[in-house]
Amino acid sequence: MSNNYKHDYEIRDDERVAIFIDGSNLYHSLEENCRRYDVDFGAFSAKLAAGRPHLRTYYYNVLRDPDRNHQAYQDQQKFLTALHSTPYLEVRLGASKLRGDVPVEKGVDIMIATDFLRMAWNDLYDTAILVSGDGDFSYAVQAVKDLGKHVVVAAFPANLSKELSQVADSKEYFTPEYFADIWSRRRGPERSGSYNNNDQGRRFGRPSPSRPRQPEDTVLDRNRRFDEKDDDFS
């Protein structure tokens, strides 16, 4: 990870930092803006913390239903195992329920807001970094500010709601370049950009005159395909 990155807001070396990651929101933002999502969460947390005392990173998402898609459940378990091995990172999982035939998140936003507020009330951090662009967190952000805490919202500009942008003390704006040195694996210049299960998706780099090499099929790649089928839960 580069030490030369300039953050979008003033950094105080003595402020205690807690990081709250809305996993589904981050996943879809990375898909949209970077066409990949295989972040090294340890390196990501370190970049966000920027050398300040780091209490912990909290990652929130929905637990897949093994009865609905067992392979997707197994792939998610492998992904979660990797997260559990990341130092100072806690995984918090909500459930999903069917609304008709469509699975919807249940309880994840409440989990994030509750931890966000509880830790501020208990004076466990000075600065909270909320990795989400979801405007539903606006009131919780204001409540944390009223407790005397500093709140940084980290998101891609195109995915940051107006309400959340206005209430945050500071913003950390993501770009594809922001993640260039914190991907969990390295790829060559050419990669299939098939994000709609279309083999003729966009390519990066000059195409080979021979049949294009298919990218390695990893757990995260399989997770993406199941996400597209299962209402995009990551």
Task: For each feature predicted by the language model, list its residue ranges.
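Generic cytosolic/nucleocytoplasmic N-terminal low-complexity/intrinsically disordered segments
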Residues: S2-Y5, G148, Y195-N197, E228
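Domain-level signal for Mg2+-assisted phosphodiester chemistry and nucleotide/NA-binding surfaces
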Residues: S2-V104, H150, N159
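Proline-rich intrinsically disordered, low-complexity coils
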Residues: P53, P66, P103, P157, ...
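Intrinsically disordered, low-complexity RNA-associated tracts
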Residues: G188-S234
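Nuclease catalytic cores that cleave nucleic-acid phosphodiester bonds
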Residues: T81-N198, R203
